[in-house]
């Protein structure tokens, strides 16, 4: 059955639009927090340490996927094609770069969200350790200074079944005026969870198709 993205309007909470957001001044960091409660290899653990300012929040979402890491990474690493699994993305256009670190993309989102578009910069693309990070640097939205880090890890328990993956995605973002940290965390967590569940469906189907072809 094809995956249908949930209606965004029921998940808005108090994050209502108030107009354009320009690149905001970063809040002075007061703490460096490990947002991930999930155990990750030491080689990538530092990527989930976020400097959290007094008007910011951070969180982590973990998603197991019944597909090998290389299959999941082939989808995640495509900075130019987030709509492959992010169903809140309407379109994406690369404006600078060719997919390497420093690449800029313009993302337009579906109607119903408190946003219209965002400009995002690729900060990390590590094909060896399976790490991708980007930050929002402009656009019309409510998530100023948003920075996301995604890491992929092999799931040893699923090795006998052809391999499995654990995806860990953490982020830090400014709390919009008129909202609380909890408002912001619940809203962004909901979006990230929807994205990662869609990633699981997409890559599990991809892995199954590859397995059928090789049978």
Report each predicted region and the residues it spans.
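Hydrophobic core residues within well-ordered beta-strands of beta-rich domains
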Residues: 59, 118, 146-148
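Hydrophobic ligand-binding cavity/cleft-lining segments
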Residues: 2-100
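Short, highly charged C-terminal tails/helix-capping segments
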Residues: 196-215
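Amphipathic alpha-helical protein-protein interaction segments
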Residues: 54, 58, 65, 111, ...
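Beta-strand/loop substructures that line and gate deep hydrophobic ligand-binding cavities in soluble
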Residues: 3-6, 135-194
């Amino acid at each position: 059955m094809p995956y249908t993205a949930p209606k965004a309007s029921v998940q808005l909470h108090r994050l209502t639009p108030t107009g354009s957001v320009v690149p905001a001044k970063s809040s002075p960091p007061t703490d460096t927090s490990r947002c991930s409660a999930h155990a990750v290899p030491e080689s990538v653990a530092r990527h989930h340490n976020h400097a959290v300012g007094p008007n910011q929040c951070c969180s982590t979402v973990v998603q197991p996927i019944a597909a090998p890491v290389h299959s999941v990474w082939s989808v995640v690493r495509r900075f130019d094609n987030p709509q492959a699994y992010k169903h809140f993305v309407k379109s994406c256009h690369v404006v600078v770069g060719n997919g390497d670190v420093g690449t800029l993309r313009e993302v337009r989102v579906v109607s119903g969200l408190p946003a219209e578009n965002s400009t995002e910069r690729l900060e990390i693309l590590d094909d060896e350790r399976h790490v991708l990070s980007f930050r929002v640097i402009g656009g019309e939205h409510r998530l100023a200074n948003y920075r996301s880090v995604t890491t992929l890890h092999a799931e040893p328990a699923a090795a006998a079944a052809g391999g499995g993956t654990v995806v860990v995605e953490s982020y830090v973002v400014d709390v919009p005026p008129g909202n609380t940290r909890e408002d912001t965390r619940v809203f962004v967590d909901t979006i990230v969870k929807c994205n990662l569940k869609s990633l699981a469906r997409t890559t599990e189907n991809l892995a199954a198709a590859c397995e059928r072809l090789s049978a």
